[in-house]
C-alpha cells in the first residue's frame, strides 16, 4: 500500500476513534483540523475536542478555524502541506470548494448511513427512529452539496432491535476504519459511483423531539426511545414535569382497550403504560434533577400509585 500524506478533519468521539486507528496505519498524518476549544460545564472550563486530544498525544499540528471565511490563512497553511487526501468525519464546519480542491485525490467523507439515505446531521438517530433494519458506512468523494458526492466504498451493518444511538455510534467508531483503509489502498484506481435511489434527509435533532407519543404503536415508541438515547432522551410529561425513560420492555396486547397513554399499573419491576396496541413497561425513570433509577428504588422515596389510571398527554 502506498504511503499517503493525510490531513484529518473531525471533532467528536467517533472522529477521534477513527483518527486513533488511522495513526496505526502506515500513512502520514500531516495535520488535524477540529472545531475551536469550547468552555463547558458549570465551571465553564475550556475543553479540547476529542480529536484535538488524540492529535496532541501524537504530536500532530492542529488547526482550529472558526470558519474558513474568518480564518482564510488556514487554507493557505493546508495548501503548503500539499496533502494527498483530506479525510473528514463529523467535522462540523462548512468547507468551501477551495478546500475540496486542495488534496491530490480530493476530500473523503466518512458518512454513517447508506447514502443517499439519511444525508445530513443525524443519520444514526433517524435510521433507528424510522425502524430501519440496516445501515452502514459510506466513503464518499466530497463535493459542494450536502452528502451528495460519489461513493467510493460501503460497509453495511445490521441495526439490532436493542441498538440505541449510543450503541450504533460505538459500532461505527470501531468499524469505519476498515472501509477507509480499503479506499486509501485503491485511491489511484478506485472508480467513484454516483449515489443511486431517492435521497432522505437526517435533520438535526431537537431537544423537544424526545417527547413520547403514546398513540403510536409500541414498536414505534421503541424506535423513538432507542433513537433518542442518550440524547436528548425520550420522556413523557407528568404533573408538568419531564420524566425521562430508561430501560423498558414491550409486554402484552392492550386487550382491555385502555386509552393510549394511560398508566395501567405500577409494580416494583416497572411502570406500565398503554400504547395504541400494547403495554410498555418502563423499568427505569429519571425525574427532574435526579439520577436515572430503577422503579423499585424510586418507590422507596416516592408515591407513584396515585398515578394509576392517569392518562398522559
Curated annotation (Swiss-Prot):
InterPro entries per UniProt: Fmt, Formyl_trans_C, Formyl_transf_N, Formyl_transf_N_sf, Formyl_transferase-like_C_sf, GART_AS, Met-tRNA-FMT_C, Met-tRNA-FMT_N
Presence of keyword Transferase: yes
EC numbers on record: 2.1.2.9
Reaction(s) catalysed (UniProt annotation): L-methionyl-tRNA(fMet) + (6R)-10-formyltetrahydrofolate = N-formyl-L-methionyl-tRNA(fMet) + (6S)-5,6,7,8-tetrahydrofolate + H(+)
Superkingdom in the source lineage: Bacteria
GO cellular component: cytosol
Annotated positions binding (6S)-5,6,7,8-tetrahydrofolate: 113-116
Signal peptide positions (record): none
Catalytic EC class: transferase
Keyword Protein biosynthesis carried by entry: yes
Gene3D superfamilies xref list: 3.40.50.12230
GO molecular function: methionyl-tRNA formyltransferase activity
Keyword entries, A-Z: Protein biosynthesis, Transferase
Reported function: Attaches a formyl group to the free amino group of methionyl-tRNA(fMet). The formyl group appears to play a dual role in the initiator identity of N-formylmethionyl-tRNA by promoting its recognition by IF2 and preventing the misappropriation of this tRNA by the elongation apparatus.
Family: Belongs to the Fmt family.
Protein name listed in UniProt: Methionyl-tRNA formyltransferase
Annotated organism of origin: Francisella tularensis subsp. holarctica (strain LVS)
